[in-house]
Structure formats: C-alpha cells, structure tokens
Amino acid sequence: FKYRKRIHSLFHFGEFARIYQSFKNFDKCFKSNSLGTQAVFKFCLDNKIKLIYSATSASLGNKGEDKNLSPYAFTKSKNLELLENLKKWFNFKYEVIYFFNVYGPRHIRSGEMATVIGIFEDQYINNKSLTIVQPGTQTRKFTHIQDTVKVCYEAWLKNKCAHYGISHKKSYSIYQVAK
C-alpha cells in the first residue's frame, strides 16, 4: 500500500442531525451545520477535493417549503444553495445524497439523538409501551443502512454534481411503524 499525498474525495456526513433538538441546541446546530460545513467546503475547494455531502429529507417536504421549519432544515438547505453556487463560481465537484430515516444495526436507541426506529426497538426490548406522538398519522420514509452505504458508494463513483435520494418508495405512518 503506497500512501497517496492527494486526497481525491471527502465524505461529509458529520453534521448536527435532529430537527427537534436543533431548537433546543441552536448554537450547536448552527456551529456544526453552517460554520463547520463551510470550513469543510473551503478545504475541499482549496485542495480540489470532490465532496460527497449528506443532505436531509427534512428540507424536501411540501415541495421544499419545509426548509424553513427548523434550524436544522434551514442550515442544511443553505448549505445546498452554497454548493450550487460553488459549482457555478469555481466548478466545484460534489455529489449530494438525501437521507431518509436510516435504520439498521447499531442505530441510536436512546437519548436525544435516538431515531424513531431505535426508540421503538428499545421500548419493545424493554417491554415498555411504544411512545407515539399523536396523532401518529404523520408519515416517514425509511432506508436500511446497507442500502444507504450502497448508494453512497455509487454516488461517489459518479462525477455528475447530482442529487440522490435514498428511501423506500412507500411512506409509513408512525402508527404503522409501531405495529
């Protein structure tokens, strides 16, 4: 194995990633998603590194109108706008991947960053009633981690400056998931 001095690509998936918590931890969300991500963008731009960036399904709802519903969705949407401008201004290379409620082995089952699938799994394993935020009819799309990894790899191979959504075609209500 010979060490390469030039970095070809960078996967940036390390942002603050929860809607509700972004209201409670605005500073943390803003610092991570805006300031931190802009530093990553600049590093990639300065070093001619292709970026593979994780977007969020939270900014896609209601034909894009949901992008201002939370600090999380807002910061992620602004990062996408910046990427598009970097492409125009500097021919910046990237691929954007939209994640939809990823689940699978080792997902977070407790605490503020837990996923809905993880919370339900933890409650089920511990013989607790599943907590459903009423009315329970709100729908979500889900993606298994193996499918997520596969699409991330496939997007990395491309050079299209394109956006890729990863989700099952069908949406499920929280009530259906709990069943």
Predicted regions and their residues:
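N-terminal Rossmann-like NAD(P)+-binding domain of SDR-like oxidoreductases, especially those catalyzing
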Residues: 1-102, 124, 146, 156
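Generic alpha-helical secondary structure signal
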Residues: 9, 115-119, 176
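Short alpha-helical
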Residues: 17, 172-173
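Aromatic/hydrophobic pocket-lining residues that form π-stacking "cages" and hydrophobic walls in ligand
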Residues: 40, 83, 120, 151, ...
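Glycine-rich "substrate-gating" loop/helix at the edge of Rossmann-like oxidoreductase active sites
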Residues: 69-72, 100-114, 134-145, 168-170
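Alpha-helical substrate-binding/gating segment
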Residues: 102, 118-131, 142-165, 171
